[in-house]
């Protein structure tokens, strides 16, 4: 039972003022509900000597309030003076935050608190309204943070930009009792920051491969049925989608899948397509998303009649081999894009976009949503190793233990929640990504997501049911299969899009050249100024001028996001990685003139290296476009559109 606290009318007024300024609605409501507390307020002679005693075990929030405050302040004003974001576990008496926020370099202090009675008392004692108003002081109750919070927080400014210098500070020894909570929170933040970095693209070469393969695949995309055609003919014709992945648990579900195949729409991963063919289970859709050559091999089969009526849905950046294999066996495929700046620059919106996540099962999940399914059932979605160590079913094309030794094993919660199971970091990333979306689907849409894998890792937010239950309860009537055939555009329309694509790619080659011609001049100017620094008396003025030139150049690169979307896809990952690493230099706190000089030199050197990379990447894009525009040129010649091509080139 808590102690009844008596606050004066002035203190109650102060509490309300603080509550008013608090933007966290959940926390606001929780604080208003509190009537009593297990804490006793202990005030010393000094105004800053405010402590709390936990009457449940007679421990104190601080052992020595003033000493601990001064130690913290000295450390933070020395080591962390320039940090834009600081993280604390525990609100304490809050005085530290008021002191630190007098430093304008600290844009936000993020405080995580498990026991909000502490905040409740302190809100009666000190005025935090100014710090709370513009979210410079952010208070979060750890028990109320969900998947959506972590993914949004860790990908937003300025938290994401400074994620490489993130660390969590304990307010005082008192909080060590919550070590489980602290470790869990720290792990979630670190994982979500890592996830955000990956989703921003962490490899420019990856982006370049995407652009190359997209341009190479353009003629096939334009001359086959579009995503728009798919939606117009197939939306809403079935209530239940079964998504077939290639985890070790798939094998045991195949007999049931075969029995109920006529009553659900079956979406299968590229890797489970040969397995279903072997067992005579015809999927309605086969999805492919990855850009590698080995993935393309899942289509290197001649299954004859089996392929009739199957619709292949292919991400536009897959390896060209995948499409070559398909053209030999069927014309029933649709090439569709995800949102990416180079792809959107071409404005081939008719061929559609949808977000596809990181895994092929995730892509199938989105596709089934866009086709208005009310129930989505996952099978074979283990995202973990089987008990015997296998990563895939026995029938898997690349062997059942294909990924068994590739990555370090990590433990995660198993399906059913009773035990732990082995997985690896890539599967964990797929799992987290899927969990974020499943949570949103169940929250905002009238769609239920079931995990009927009956094995593997637990996917938070899905409804875990036996596959038999799902078949018996959700699948009652036969669907009219095969579904209506999809048609490509008329030849005239195709020609129009082929020419439009050719024009845009050709323009992009020109953009690369123009950008680099300009860029090299700026780079040379900065480099020459830098070289003459070493022997100049006017170093400080000179350094400021160089840094101003660098800032101008960075502004020009940032403007590409609005002016030349075709260049930003390859520069995006480069920029992200550069800014994340630069944060470490940004926060160095120079004590002497020499320190300041060295920091500036380091800053300029980093930017010169970055500029060399920018130049190199744009050059690589130019070369890639020149090489991969060839299939488009062939197609235009084949259709006797040479003179129009000439016009574009002129």
Question: What are the residue ranges of the model-derived segments?
Answer:
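Phosphate-binding loop/pocket of nucleotide- and phosphate-handling active sites
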Residues: 390-437
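Short, basic, glycine/proline-bearing loop/turn elements
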Residues: 82-86, 239-243, 287-289, 343-354, ...
